[in-house]
């Protein structure tokens, strides 16, 4: 499988782009003409720089407004093409992209266009060059890959071929199955891009909102299955125009791009096993049966406060690590680890972020296979020295530099608590909490696509539609990633400014990370009463919320009174009811949530503005120093 990406897809100057593309593992690069024109080196120097990075130039692009022009403009178009051929030979590439004409001067007619390409093919052939024709979705006369293919077919020249671009086909909702009839050897290169479904002008949509395959809503897998069925075995190249990417990190965007291609072709190869493209074999996407544990890093004072808070939620301290300053608290199937070590990643994380949930462990069928898939998709492995009676738990780095561990039932990993911890007889008072319902990570909005692709490519999950959560200081974008059975539920919350609750958390903890944990319970009313007995400080909700709730959902006054008396929030969808109870904030915005579900599949987005307003009232006032 030969991977490629257009230089226009990432930020930086040409030198920075090439370094990032090579580091991400791509085989080739499309040179976008503006990137070349802005660089102060000669074509030969650019070609050498590309090859010095271990890359090849898969394509030079774009060449515009060529076919179907009146005679005066037609002659000029061929003169321009010859100049581009000179440039290509100096660069060291043999393929040029010609996009369909958008000029108001362009004349229609498939035969006229085919004649032009036949002559261009003759000129290219004399130089051992090739030309690929692409139908722009907004082309004046050619906006459909079927018409572009017919022009190429009638041109009937070995140096003229077709270029397919997933965006141009899918944005116009064309039938991708028509691609299967095209001979694979007549497709010179395939360009790939995804995009969110937005109803807007095609050109503007394409120029500003494309993203990596798997990050948007277009059926790119179906498109690529049809391409693969033709027998095509050439480069797979990303061409992404995205305002957010233009200001992002070249290296992280390039890594996302390579991950997206590997993930895309893994899906295609599983659906079309006899394709000609040589796709690397990966373990299947990983099914997660639950969150085994969450680990906090803290100093002694903050750890003591956290343990007291957890005890007030009904947790028992059941274990102390044999070799480290680490304790284990449990309630139901919830394991919370509190780490106060003075060395290792936990300590480093504490020094940077303060007290935080820096790691969590997922229950999987095969931890080694999970890491193998993650590594093939560009995830960074995590390892650290372990002592006697300690297991080497497979792990990767995640959001904010945190760690995701993997626990399976087929090895010693299933006995990690018995192997590494001494029992502690510090029983608490059970409050009816059962398991971790979901985990929420706050991050800068610009990071959301990265982590969305990270989770959906490695784990057997799906993404739900993005939701705008209204904070008194702005909007937070919330993206749910979940497995069908609820074994893994994550909410990714993207902050665009520091004044929102999520933005405050990111700013004060110096980076993205886990901002809240939600625990499921058997009976939220009994749990709320038990928490009151244990001295748990519940988040107080405005009484105005309950008056509106009763009217909006037609609740019985008695039921509303029970909710209000315990500061329980309530929501309902077509599946059933949902109850939520929150802790006050801990540290710089971390909090716990307790939920009860009755067929409800959402996350209480309707209640979020009222919860956030209540939480912000409890935060340290602006300008007040930390104690």
How does the language model describe each region?
Residues 1-93, 254-285:
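N-terminal pre-domain/capping segments
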Residues 8-15, 32-43, 65-75, 103-108, ...:
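Acidic-and-aromatic substrate-binding clefts and catalytic sites of carbohydrate-active enzymes
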Residues 46-63, 114-127, 152-157, 218-223:
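Alpha-helix-loop-beta-strand connector modules within alpha/beta enzyme cores
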């Amino acid at each position: 499988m030969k991977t490629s990406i257009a230089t226009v897809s990432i930020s930086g100057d040409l030198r920075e782009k090439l370094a990032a593309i090579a580091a991400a593992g791509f085989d080739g690069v499309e040179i976008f003409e503006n990137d070349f024109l802005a660089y102060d080196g000669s074509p030969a120097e650019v070609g050498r720089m590309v090859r010095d990075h271990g890359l090849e130039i898969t394509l030079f692009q774009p060449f515009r407004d060529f076919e179907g022009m009146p005679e005066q403009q037609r002659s000029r178009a061929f003169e321009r093409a010859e100049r581009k051929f000179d440039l290509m030979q100096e660069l060291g590439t043999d393929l040029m992209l010609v996009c369909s004409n958008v000029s108001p001067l362009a004349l229609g007619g498939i035969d006229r266009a085919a004649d032009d390409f036949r002559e261009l093919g003759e000129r290219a052939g004399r130089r051992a060059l090739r030309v690929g024709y692409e139908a722009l979705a907004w082309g004046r006369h050619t906006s459909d890959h079927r018409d572009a293919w017919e022009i190429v077919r009638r041109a009937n020249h070995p140096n003229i071929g077709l270029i397919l671009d997933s965006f141009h086909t899918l944005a116009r909702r064309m039938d991708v199955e028509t691609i299967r009839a095209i001979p694979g050897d007549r497709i010179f290169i395939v360009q790939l891009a995804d995009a969110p479904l937005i109803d807007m002008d095609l050109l503007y949509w394409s120029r500003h909102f494309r993203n990596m395959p798997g990050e948007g809503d277009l059926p790119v897998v179906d498109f690529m299955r049809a391409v693969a069925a033709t027998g095509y075995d050439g480069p797979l190249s990303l061409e992404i125009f995205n305002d957010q990417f233009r200001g992002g990190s070249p290296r992280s965007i390039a890594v996302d791009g390579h991950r997206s291609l590997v993930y895309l072709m893994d899906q295609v190869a599983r659906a079309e096993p006899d394709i000609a493209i040589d796709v690397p074999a990966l373990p299947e996407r990983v099914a997660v049966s639950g969150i085994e544990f969450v680990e906090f890093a803290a100093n002694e004072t903050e750890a003591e406060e956290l343990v007291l808070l957890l005890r007030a939620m009904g947790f028992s301290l059941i274990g102390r690590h044999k070799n480290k300053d680490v304790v284990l608290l449990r309630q139901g199937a919830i394991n919370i680890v509190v780490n106060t070590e003075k060395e290792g990643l936990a300590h480093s994380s504490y020094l940077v972020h303060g007290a935080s949930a820096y790691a969590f462990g997922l229950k999987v069928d095969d931890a080694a296979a999970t890491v193998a898939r993650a590594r093939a998709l560009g995830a960074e492995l995590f390892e650290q020295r372990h002592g006697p009676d300690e297991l080497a738990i497979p792990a990767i780095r995640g959001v904010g530099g945190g760690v995701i561990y993997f626990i399976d039932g087929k090895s010693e990993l299933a006995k990690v608590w018995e192997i590494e911890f001494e029992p502690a007889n510090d029983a608490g008072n059970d409050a009816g909490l059962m398991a971790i319902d979901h985990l929420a990570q706050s991050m800068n909005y610009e990071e959301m696509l990265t982590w969305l692709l990270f989770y959906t490519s490695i784990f057997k999950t799906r993404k739900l539609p993005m939701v705008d959560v209204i904070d008194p200081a702005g909007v937070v974008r919330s993206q749910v990633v979940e497995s069908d059975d609820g074994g893994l539920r994550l909410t990714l919350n993207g902050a665009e400014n520091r004044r929102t609750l999520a933005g405050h958390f990111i700013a004060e903890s110096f980076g993205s990370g886990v901002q809240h944990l939600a625990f499921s319970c058997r009976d939220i009313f009994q749990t709320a009463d038990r928490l009151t007995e244990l001295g748990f400080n519940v988040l107080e909700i405005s009484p105005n919320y309950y008056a509106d709730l009763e009217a909006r959902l037609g609740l019985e006054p008695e039921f509303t009174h029970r909710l209000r008396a315990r500061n329980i929030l309530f929501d309902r969808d077509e599946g059933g009811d949902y109850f939520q109870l929150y802790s006050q904030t801990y540290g710089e915005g971390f909090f716990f949530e307790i939920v009860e579900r009755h067929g409800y599949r959402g996350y209480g987005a309707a209640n979020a503005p009222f919860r956030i307003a209540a939480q912000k009232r409890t935060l340290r006032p602006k300008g007040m120093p930390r104690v």
